[in-house]
Amino acid sequence: MGKNTKRNKKTKQQQQQPQQNGVTASASGTAVEDFEDQQAASSLPSLNGKKRSQLNKLVEELLDLVEKQPANPNEEWKQYGQLQELLKQIMILEEPLSQAVCPQISDSPDDQTRLAKVEAFSAWAKDGGVHSEGLEIAIFPGYQLGLRATRPLAKDELVLSVPRKLILSEENNSDCRLFGKMTQATHLNLAYDLVIEKIRGEFSEWRPYIDVLPAKYNTVLYFTTKQMELLRGTAAAALAMRQCRVIAKQYAFLYKYAHTMTEPSTGNRSHPGERGLFFTQHGLCYKLYRWAVSTVMTRQNLVPSEKQESEDGPKLISALIPYWDMANHRPGKITSFYATVSRQLECTAQEAVNTGEQFFIYYGDRSNTDLLVHNGFVDPNNTKDYVNIRVGLSLTDALAAKRASILDKLNIRHTAELRVLPAPDFISKELLAFVRVFKMSAEQLDHWCSDLDRAGDLLHIDCALETDHETRTWQFLEDRLKLLLAVFNKEMHEADEVKELELKDGQEIELMLFLYRRLERSILAGALQYAQEHRKV
């Protein structure tokens, strides 16, 4: 693996020295790494006792807040506002530390700053075994950094490969694992490892890669309350606020464990997790954790674990793949795969690319809601887009058990989020079947329950049903879609607002949110017209 200059120099010197045995070499290397750990930690500012005490109190309040599950959208919005206020106070107290580990970038785009470090990163990647002949990193308006073709690339041509040793996953820093036997999502393990490497600064072997990562993101973790308010009433609102709640809770757990549940760590490598605890105690702050989680959310890919097994083979774990993750998204097909035999990620061109054009990859089938919340962008040409509608059986419905038996046969949950689709389908078969079951009379339920093997017919648009039943089904869908669209009708001057925003700098998030609203409204409006036409028929 390519390493920074200091680490390379150190390694060469060690190789040149005669060694009497492996133990001596190992002890020497450990001593150097221990010294580097201490150097990295000592370079960071420490908070005084008063600020630490205030932070401890705020983190306890934060944990108490996020433990409460909001009962409805209004409560969820109120909780989000309280959460943002607490995080604001926490970030003010942590500011000296934040400036050290996540230095503020000026209002000008940070891509020029990153581009200045691209040369060092490209050399590091090449030394580490990345093969990217025909590609280079460049600035593209509207994308920041991306990959540019330096020669014509043929469709299906292998254009990029990244070896396992240059793929950052939770298995790289297992000695830093803070959580012991606690089960944690793989992407959060990776985010924690990235926190550690960021704190290690110049002593991290991943420094050239970290230096070219964005300084901030357009993910929901960076939204202001005013920006989040633009999502209220949309399908993305609950998911976005839930994401903020989960990450705040995880940060608070890490903070509490490091500062109120354990003694100060010396970073003793002989004790599992001590190095991680050591760096967490010295460098963890919310801005750093938010950055690390956003980095993972926007750039991760899954690779097979080399240490963990599942019932179906190697467990899939989250990973950051340097150089490959510079490629931006365009609709198409997935052309990136991990080759187990050669232990590398391989990427082919999904289309022919001319010299000087941007090289794109396809991130996979995701709705714009998912792209917005987890990737920080939306795709106006997304053919796989959809809008979720939450539906559920009533607990007070005397016929709920019969409805449930039909839904069980259809593998549809009794309370579920089901899809409204773009043209030409509009209503997913699962949503249509659910509403058909939901609007059945007692007699109709008896008829369908008497032969559950026929339940699959309810998934088809041309299923033979009584006219009054179909009318009730489409009327329900029409009414529900009108309610969902009502939230957009409140914004009568949205087009004017977009034009005004386009004339200002630094409005990327607002423009993205208005685009998302327009795309969701378009799907719902198309489905409403479709439902109205079917009701009339």
From Swiss-Prot:
CDD domains: SET_SETD3. Residues 1-50 are annotated as: Disordered. Disruption phenotype: No visible phenotype. Cells show complete loss of actin histidine methylation. Residues 133-364 form the SET domain. Keywords: Actin-binding, Cytoplasm, Methyltransferase, Nucleus, S-adenosyl-L-methionine, Transferase. It is an enzyme of class 2 (transferase). GO terms for biological process: actin modification; peptidyl-histidine methylation; positive regulation of transcription by RNA polymerase II. Residues 1-12 have a biased composition (Basic residues). It comes from the Eukaryota. InterPro entries: Rubisco_LSMT_subst-bd, Rubisco_LSMT_subst-bd_sf, SET_dom, SET_dom_sf, SETD3, SETD3_SET, SETD3_SETD6_MTase. It catalyses: L-histidyl-[protein] + S-adenosyl-L-methionine = N(tele)-methyl-L-histidyl-[protein] + S-adenosyl-L-homocysteine + H(+). GO terms for cellular component: cytoplasm; nucleus. S-adenosyl-L-methionine binds at residues 114, 143-145, 299, 325-329, 375-377. Its EC number is 2.1.1.85. The keyword Transcription does not apply. It is found in: Cytoplasm; Nucleus. Protein-histidine N-methyltransferase that specifically mediates 3-methylhistidine (tele-methylhistidine) methylation of actin at 'His-74'. This is Actin-histidine N-methyltransferase.
